[in-house]
Amino acid sequence: MGNLKGVRIAGTGSYVPERIVTNEDLAALGCDSDWIVRRTGILQRRHAEPGQATSDLCYEAALRCLENANVSVDEIDLILVATITPDHPTPSTACHLQRRLGAVAPAMDIGAACAGFMYALVTGAQFVSNGNARNVLVIGADLMSRTVDPEDKKTYPLFGDAAGAALLVPSTQDECQSTECNGSAADSTIQTDGLLAYQLGSEGCGGEMLCIPAGGSRTPITTDGEDSASRYLQMDGRGVFKWAVRVFDESAKDVLRAANVSSDQLSLVVLHQANQRIIDSAVSDLNVPPEKVFVNLDKYGNTSGASIPLALDEAARAGRLKEGDLVLLCGFGAGLAWGTALFRW
């Protein structure tokens, strides 16, 4: 648990591939479109074209983010890319992006799957908060359509491809000096910028619930094709559902308690867009009304590390976020790993 002062999100950006894959398209492959909607809330998703790689999506999202923040490539001090679908095992996708942008900045990948953007966000915020960087470009991006088996009718429909970006910069605010923060004098001691509270966690004992068994040093991919099924994402859907709901409930309450903020003070809740049933179940115990919960998984499906920044960018462009808003973010997924943070916009 921690908090980081002196940092804010100056801009966001996102990119999704042009190709839309609807539930009706998947029905032609043998998937049950009614089941998809009923069990997940997903209506369509985006798939990258052959030849498109993760860094290509990152590049487009980065350009839009920098433009939105009115920051030039030359001003970037650090690039962080959260992904589990890198262009290559090495070099990192962040280095591919750094080269293409023409930036002169260190760059590295962070691999925490659906929680990856939260890990990258907190990491980047550390650099800004302690004065070691002024402009940190944080990106979450995944081409999940390349990791799922088209023959797996229960898993293949869940995922899509996307990239989302946020630019972290220093903030000049420290403490609330008037009643303008939240409308009462009692709020005058609440930190008014940055990550008011965050929690990163992992439960590696549950790693097998959500994994790609082959392709690493433990189980290298062979040329005989015998390990073909192990190349794809394997998921214990029921187990992940129960774990995700529990870990969000616990971590969200911990974070709100640490920040001395109640759930009714929240302006917006942005969870990892995995499944509508998970989102509904997770927020119900917080007593957060549906209108304060941002959802776009119906359009994009589960985009893994891109999920939260994609949602943040859409929320910002839709006018759902204004200066001073309290935003609760939570990502959870393979590892098992999670990251929850309370951010003042």
UniProtKB/Swiss-Prot annotation:
A GO CC annotation given for this chain: cytoplasm
UniProt-listed Enzyme Commission number(s): 2.3.1.180
Principal place of residence: cytoplasm
Cytoplasm found in the keyword field: yes
Catalytic activity line of the entry: malonyl-[ACP] + acetyl-CoA + H(+) = 3-oxobutanoyl-[ACP] + CO2 + CoA
Residue span of region ACP-binding: 273-277
CDD domains for this protein: KAS_III
GO molecular function: 3-oxoacyl-[acyl-carrier-protein] synthase activity; beta-ketoacyl-acyl-carrier-protein synthase III activity
Active-site residues, Swiss-Prot/TrEMBL: 114, 272, 302
Disulfide pairings: none
Alphabetical list of InterPro entries matching this protein: ACP_syn_III_C (IPR013747), ACP_syn_III_N (IPR013751), FabH (IPR004655), Thiolase-like (IPR016039)
Pfam family, one: ACP_syn_III
Entry keyword annotation includes NADP: no
A GO BP annotation: fatty acid biosynthetic process
Pathway per the UniProt entry: Lipid metabolism; fatty acid biosynthesis
Keyword annotations from UniProtKB, A to Z: Acyltransferase, Cytoplasm, Fatty acid biosynthesis, Fatty acid metabolism, Lipid biosynthesis, Lipid metabolism, Multifunctional enzyme, Transferase
Location(s), subcellular: Cytoplasm
NCBIfam families noted in UniProt: fabH, PRK09352.1
Family (UniProt): Belongs to the thiolase-like superfamily. FabH family.
Domain notes: The last Arg residue of the ACP-binding site is essential for the weak association between ACP/AcpP and FabH.
Protein role: Catalyzes the condensation reaction of fatty acid synthesis by the addition to an acyl acceptor of two carbons from malonyl-ACP. Catalyzes the first condensation reaction which initiates fatty acid synthesis and may therefore play a role in governing the total rate of fatty acid production. Possesses both acetoacetyl-ACP synthase and acetyl transacylase activities. Its substrate specificity determines the biosynthesis of branched-chain and/or straight-chain of fatty acids.
Subunit structure: Homodimer.
Protein name: Beta-ketoacyl-[acyl-carrier-protein] synthase III
Species the sequence originates in: Rhodopirellula baltica (strain DSM 10527 / NCIMB 13988 / SH1)
The organism's taxonomic lineage, starting at the top: Bacteria, Pseudomonadati, Planctomycetota, Planctomycetia, Pirellulales
